[in-house]
Amino acid sequence: QANMTSLNGIRFGFNCSMLRAWWVMLGLPVLLALVFWFALYLIAQVTTSIGGLFFNLVALSLLSAIGLGVVHGITYSKWMPLLGNNATFGIHKFSIQVNVKECIKGCMLAILTMVPFIIVIGIMIAPVFQQLMMMTMLGRSDAGSEFVLQYYPQIMASYFLYFVAILVFASYLYVTLRSLFLNNLTLANGTIRFHSSVTAIGMLLRMLAVLMGSSITCGLAYPWLKMWMV
């Protein structure tokens, strides 16, 4: 892609070891994910014998958020130098130095943006599960259609909030990582610096516009709308 792109007649370039690219793009994320899930499994075995169900859910949810933030933060902190330090523009080389802690912090904050939505969804959907369990205990499993109609507004509202939560999470994470990448990227030994001014709200509005535009055009406008988010 870089070799086929040019600006004012000057071509971009990219040169990187295939083995290193495979390790950074695939090997390291898989290894970190395996270590994370194994550690979470061991912690779950310990907490099961210590506290009750509510304590285990809270503890494991908190540890999962922290672990996912660490895994994604480390992964993205390796991806950025792979792309930035191996790219060129004509005879000039790009250079980037990324702080791993900032990447981890950004990923954790992105995950935390979903917490308010999860709490609201839990409050809305809890009566649904309670009623479902009660019906199962009373042997009224055949009344499923009536049950769905009764709680249809809560179920649809929960799906809608879940969809909004994903968009908020994606927009915040994209803007955070984009800012970390561009604000630390330099060209020609630091002579030229880059800056990102996109906000999370602005990116969220762009994502909504892309989804609406793609839906209206049955996906035909997606390639052009996607370029608007770069």
Where do the language-model regions lie?
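Transmembrane-helix bundle segments that line or gate the permeation/cavity pathway
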Residues: 1-40, 44, 65-77
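Loop-to-transmembrane boundary segments
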Residues: 14-34, 96-117, 196-216
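Hydrophobic, aromatic-rich membrane-embedded alpha-helical segments
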Residues: 1, 66-73, 115, 208-228
